[in-house]
Swiss-Prot record:
PANTHER family, alphabetized: PHOSPHATASE WITH HOMOLOGY TO TENSIN, PHOSPHATIDYLINOSITOL 3,4,5-TRISPHOSPHATE 3-PHOSPHATASE AND DUAL-SPECIFICITY PROTEIN PHOSPHATASE PTEN
Reaction(s) catalysed (UniProt annotation): a 1,2-diacyl-sn-glycero-3-phospho-(1D-myo-inositol-3,4,5-trisphosphate) + H2O = a 1,2-diacyl-sn-glycero-3-phospho-(1D-myo-inositol-4,5-bisphosphate) + phosphate
EC number assigned by the record: 3.1.3.67
Organism expressing this protein natively: Saccharomyces cerevisiae (strain ATCC 204508 / S288c) (Baker's yeast)
Keywords per UniProt: Hydrolase
Name this protein carries in UniProt: Probable phosphatidylinositol 3,4,5-trisphosphate 3-phosphatase TEP1
GO molecular function annotation: phosphatidylinositol-3,4,5-trisphosphate 3-phosphatase activity; protein tyrosine phosphatase activity
Catalytic center residues: C193
Residue stretches making up the Phosphatase tensin-type domain: 33-255
A biological process from GO: phosphatidylinositol 3-kinase/protein kinase B signal transduction
Functional description taken from the UniProt entry: May act as a phosphoinositide 3-phosphatase by regulating PtdIns(3,4,5)P3 levels.
One GO location term (cellular component): cytoplasm
Pfam family, one: DSPc
SUPFAM superfamilies cross-referenced by the UniProt entry: (Phosphotyrosine protein) phosphatases II
Length: 434
């Protein structure tokens, strides 16, 4: 592939010049874009020869001014990888009227069917010239498997921006990508979220860890160096997304049979634990004052993973003050079940007025995602290394189980590392198996 040039589009069997769009160039500055020899201006990055990450493609204005063109993306994939050899994995959970539909994909694919001769001619030229992307990792040792042929162009498996997916979904997606790619060395998986950073990065890193045996640190580095220009970003950085990658790291150290066992037991576990106690360790003087209130929300995804459901709200003015200065809340006995994957959010407000609280809430905001089942396993395995230690019935203990997360390990505003005003030194969460 050559250096970036002017953008071209297929028309009347060949190519037509059109001006380069400045907005696309500005918005994709941090990305290390793969150049192509047919003049298409696309924000795409090859992580492997058969694994692409890109930003969100669109087919309507005004977003066509600064996003990937869906037409251009499909044309690129058809020319460089061949008709029927690619599948798009869409990780966006948020919905907008301008989102591309399945019918849009089908229509674009059909349009290029009518230009098949010209596309195949162009593809043959590129192959003969050796202008096919090269992967930094050798894939020759991959074992191919047979699969029934299907014409699915896109799989929509999304969740909300800046968050990790439910852990079971993370494993399902990674395995789904491998199942698709393992059918043929000609196939390519195209991953996108909004910017091709956090959600796509998580899945890419998890895939490299599981199927190319890369350590977590190395997998993060491969993604960062392949997707971004030097010094622009560290790639996947949101603490909860990294926590779920560490869960994944823990999970894949088990043999395949144990992995299946853990997945099966996780379904049972969500009805077998009770959130018992929450403690703010060394709270700041700010939240121990009479006027300031910290609102804690305990949430999980809805079924479509495009919104959060709030299961419990706790206000700091009803928390107990312990001798050491810590603040605690003990959950009622009726509060028994949560999803394994839950989110805890902390916002600062005031008891003086709603308007003031709304303004103050922007001065401090922090949150975290946890998978309670995996947190339990990572605690239990220190004392119980039996082959079936992960079974729910073996997890019961007389004492509470728990985890402590420092303020710095919480998520901040969106993808930013900043949390605003520090509310406490650390969060301690405790639960019991019932």
């Amino acid at each position: 592939m050559r250096e970036e040039g002017s953008e071209l589009e297929m028309e009347k069997g060949f190519l037509k010049w059109k001006p380069v769009n400045l907005m696309k160039k500005i918005l994709s500055l941090p990305m290390k874009k793969t150049k192509n020899d047919i003049g298409l201006r696309l924000d795409i990055s090859y992580i492997l020869v058969n694994l692409i990450v890109c930003s969100y493609p669109v087919n309507t204005y005004p977003k066509l001014l600064y996003r990937n063109s869906l037409d251009d993306l499909i044309l690129f994939l058809t020319v460089y990888h061949g008709k029927g050899n690619f599948r798009i994995f869409n990780f966006r959970g948020e919905k907008e009227d301008s989102d591309y539909k399945d019918n849009d994909l089908i229509g674009i694919a059909a349009k290029f069917e009518s230009k098949d001769f010209e596309i195949q001619e162009l593809r043959s030229t590129l192959i003969n010239d050796g202008k096919i992307p090269i992967s930094p990792i050798d894939l020759e040792t991959r074992t191919l498997v047979e699969e029934e042929t299907n014409n699915v162009i896109c799989e929509r498996i999304g969740w909300l921006d800046h968050f990790p997916p439910p852990f079971e979904l993370l494993e399902e997606i990674v395995d789904g990508i491998e199942n698709y790619l393992s059918v043929s060395k000609n196939r390519v998986a195209v991953l996108h979220c909004r910017m091709g950073k956090g959600r796509s990065g998580m899945i890419t890193v998890a895939y490299l860890m599981k199927y190319l045996q890369c350590p977590l640190g190395e997998a993060r580095l491969i993604f960062m160096q392949a997707r971004f220009k030097y010094g622009m970003t560290n790639g996947v950085t949101i603490p909860s997304q990294l926590r779920y990658l560490r869960y994944h790291e823990f999970f894949i150290t088990h043999e395949k049979a144990a992995q299946e066992g853990i997945s099966n037991e996780a379904v049972k576990f969500k009805f077998k634990f009770r959130l018992a106690k929450m403690t703010f360790l060394r709270p700041s003087s700010l939240i121990t004052s009479e006027s300031a209130i910290v609102t804690t929300k305990i949430q999980h995804y809805n079924d479509d993973r495009n919104a959060l459901l709030t299961r419990k709200v706790v206000y700091s003015d009803i928390m107990a003050h312990e001798c050491g200065g810590n603040m605690t809340f003990i959950f009622g006995r009726d509060y028994l079940t949560l999803e394994n994957d839950c989110r805890i959010e902390f916002t600062l407000g005031t008891s003086k007025s709603k308007a003031a609280s709304s303004i103050i809430s922007w001065t401090s905001c922090a949150s975290c995602w946890l998978n309670i089942y995996l947190e339990t396993l990572m605690h239990i395995i220190k004392d119980d290394s039996s082959p079936d230690y992960f079974q729910v019935e073996r997890l019961k203990r007389d004492e509470m189980l728990g985890t402590t997360i420092s303020w710095q390990e919480l998520d901040g505003f969106g993808e930013l590392s900043t949390h605003g005003l520090k509310l406490f030194q650390a969060l301690k969460l405790e639960w019991e198996i019932i």
